[in-house]
A protein has these predicted regions:
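Conserved catalytic cores of phosphodiester-cleaving nucleases, focusing on short active-site segments
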Residues: 36-57, 74
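Basic, glycine-rich
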Residues: 29-30, 100
Length: 118
């Protein structure tokens, strides 16, 4: 998928989270360690969300692309975010899978995996 398609998937997941009373605090957060697609509060837990948008599963499930290396970069980036914002709170790493025939597909489906990795 293109960057524009990925951005569309991230916006879709942001709306999904808002609809479930999450409070979004960052979108496409970047630092020297990497990027986190979405950062949101779920009650008193700060969630770091990786979004994967796909049109099919021929090459595997989207969650399978959150490799051990990607997880390590996400953890480092999250630690930097917590430190730079002086936060000491419960955290969670979630993965959101967006399935859509094409970007903008009104039939798009989101599979949201809470606590997808530690």
């Amino acid at each position: 998928m293109s960057r524009a398609e990925g951005t569309w998937g991230e916006a879709l997941v942001a709306d999904y989270l808002r609809g479930r009373s999450y409070r979004l605090v960052a979108h496409s957060y970047h630092c020297r360690f990497g990027e986190i697609d979405l950062i949101a509060w779920d009650g008193d837990t700060l969630c770091f969300v990786e979004v994967k948008t796909r049109t099919n599963t021929q090459m595997g499930l989207p969650r399978e692309y959150v490799t051990a290396g990607k997880q390590a970069r996400l953890r480092k980036t999250a630690l930097f975010y917590l430190s730079s914002h002086d936060l000491d709170c419960p955290t969670r790493f979630d993965v959101a899978e967006v399935y859509a025939a094409v970007p903008g597909d009104p039939e798009a489906c989101i599979e949201y995996l809470e606590d997808a990795f530690q």
